[in-house]
């Protein structure tokens, strides 16, 4: 009796190299984490990184240094696809906002414009209680 196989054997899909010169960097900086997504002009994600994905855990994810490392990792992966210039969109109140932008520039990406797209409620849901630090 032949040995049973568990479904089809899947080959790892090779990432195809897109050639994109201009893109957008979306930086979402919360009190707990920083997520950097780099997209093409249509919004399709080329690369992303977060403070947790880069190796930081717990309260260290919310530091500016973690945001810097996440932005560098996302920028390196995006440059492999030929990205040279980005427009930056920053969202959220976190501590890693400026650091992430600076590290995108330091990684070799040319920053065209910086926009703050933090959503502001027009008296919608009740916000969480005030932080006591």
From Swiss-Prot:
GO terms for cellular component: ribonucleoprotein complex; ribosome. PROSITE patterns: RIBOSOMAL_S11 (PS00054). Residues 1-23 are annotated as: Disordered. SUPFAM superfamilies: Translational machinery components (SSF53137). One of its GO terms (molecular function) is rRNA binding. Keywords: Ribonucleoprotein, Ribosomal protein, RNA-binding, rRNA-binding. Residues 7-17 have a biased composition (Basic residues). Pfam families: Ribosomal_S11. GO terms for biological process: translation. InterPro entries: Ribosomal_uS11 (IPR001971), Ribosomal_uS11_bac-type (IPR019981), Ribosomal_uS11_CS (IPR018102), Ribosomal_uS11_sf (IPR036967). Part of the 30S ribosomal subunit. Interacts with proteins S7 and S18. Binds to IF-3. Located on the platform of the 30S subunit, it bridges several disparate RNA helices of the 16S rRNA. Forms part of the Shine-Dalgarno cleft in the 70S ribosome. HAMAP family: Ribosomal_uS11. This is Small ribosomal subunit protein uS11. It comes from Arthrobacter sp. (strain FB24).
